[in-house]
Regions:
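C-terminal cap of metal-dependent C-N hydrolases
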Residues: 8, 342, 352-383
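Active-site mouth loops of central-metabolism enzymes
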Residues: 61-74, 139-146, 189-193
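Divalent-metal coordination cores built from histidine and acidic residues
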Residues: 81-163
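Histidine-rich, glycine-flanked metal-binding segment
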Residues: 1-51
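His/Asp/Glu-enriched, well-ordered alpha-helical/loop segment
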Residues: 233-242, 260-272, 278-364
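Conserved, mostly hydrophobic/aromatic
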Residues: 127, 183, 213, 321, ...
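Metal-associated gating/positioning segment near the N- to mid-region
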Residues: 45-105
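Active-site core of metal-dependent hydrolases
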Residues: 154, 158-280
Length: 383
């Protein structure tokens, strides 16, 4: 027999449904109804809102786990379970620019065992690199940066059992257009970033099939009135998604607002770019091969002081854009769930409350603070 969630409002892609009940059937979402059968079991969240579980499509680590360490038990358990306390129920473990062999080993482990994740569900693998440009290397190792090669990608995808569903590259690398055209034709999402590309170079990559901008504004050629660069292309080119880190450190809130106005909330995917120190205390950590200092809400390279990923919680990024008065609660929820899922073509399994989908959802209070996280209709985290 189904049970029912009672709440003040429910966040759907098309808008907010107020009152009523959401049916749960065998761990799946059912219908939204106004009346329920007599004697039905009710999960009462009167005074609260129900939103889809959040989807983090760019995250390198959490809780002491770094995806690049290839500690598969840590990724499957420590990281995936820890993310439930962040409101995240689906994620893409994200790599860094590294050697062909190390990336092969990481993908092989995740591809073989991703279904064993005991918390947030692994919905794919995101390769952030290695086909980047040294000038905008960020916290990535330029020693491994190079032009894209189909033989490498094929080997990684085979090792991943087809789970590699997103890869980021710099549009100005040699052979990008053919590479992008080929892999997007196979359903892989191509993101553009860590790049010194001109507007025209970026546009050619988008015309070939690229559709996401990596951590907007960061690691990309800026806009001037003579050369629009990557930022100008991100603003101007339609039907593309911009990843956005809303921690108040990576991007000024006003710049976030400009981007949202340029692209529309439906084309913004909130991400964390979180590294191993997420959920932990300030101190010294590693991001891949690089020593990092975490303090005052940021993670920075010891060598240069440059930002090195973040320690942002996705639930806080959602709340920030509302507190900054640049998005409504419904828009913010969609930017942290439905939009990122759509951006990598996994909205057929997650990112929205929809009949037949896994009942992965979160409970929010009136201030958009996380109250609880559910997986398959079962409460897995209580604030």
């Amino acid at each position: 027999m189904p049970n029912y969630i009672k709440a003040d409002q429910f966040f759907y892609p098309h808008g907010v449904r107020r009152g009523g009940y959401l049916e749960l059937v065998d761990g799946k979402f059912g219908k939204h109804v106004e009346q329920i059968p007599e004697g039905a079991e009710v999960i009462d969240y009167t005074g609260y809102s129900i939103a889809p579980g959040l989807v983090d499509t760019h995250i390198h680590g959490f809780g002491g786990v770094d995806v690049m360490d290839n500690n598969i038990e840590g990724t499957l358990h420590t990281m995936s379970e820890g993310l439930l306390s962040m409101g995240v129920t689906s994620f893409l473990p994200t790599t860094l620019t590294s050697s062909y062999e190390q990336l092969l080993a990481v993908t092989e482990n995740i591809g073989a065992r991703y279904q064993e994740a005991s918390g947030a569900k692994i919905r794919g693998i995101y390769f952030e690199g290695p086909y980047f440009t040294e000038k905008y290397k960020g916290a990535q190792n330029p020693a491994y940066m190079k032009d894209p090669r189909m033989d490498e990608f094929r080997a990684w995808q085979k090792a991943a059992n087809g789970l590699l569903n997103k890869i980021a590259l710099a549009p100005e690398r040699e052979g990008v257009e053919d590479f992008v055209r080929t892999i997007t034709g196979e359903g892989v999402t191509v993101a553009l970033g860590h790049s010194n590309a001109t507007f025209d170079e970026a546009k050619k990559a988008v015309d070939a099939g690229a559709s996401v901008w990596v951590h907007a504004y960061n690691g990309m050629r800026g806009l001037t009135h003579r050369e629009l660069g990557m930022v100008g292309a991100m603003y101007q080119l339609p039907h593309t998604y911009a990843e956005l880190i809303c921690d108040g450190h990576h991007v000024d809130p006003k710049a976030c607002e400009i981007l949202i106005k340029q692209k529309g909330t439906e084309n913004i995917a909130l991400i964390t770019d979180c590294m191993t120190a997420g959920g932990l205390e300030d101190g010294d950590y590693m991001l891949g091969e690089f020593p990092v200092v975490v303090a005052n809400g940021t993670a920075r390279l010891k060598s240069t002081g440059n930002l090195a990923g973040s320690i942002l919680k996705l639930k806080d990024g959602l709340k920030n854009v509302v507190d900054w008065n640049i998005a409504s609660p419904h828009e913010a929820v969609m930017m942290a769930s439905f939009n990122p899922a759509k951006s990598v073509h996994i909205d057929d399994v997650c990112g929205q409350i929809r009949e037949g989908y896994d009942a992965d959802f979160i409970v929010l209070d009136k201030d958009l603070e996380l109250v609880a996280t559910y997986l398959d209709g079962v409460k897995r985290y209580q604030a």
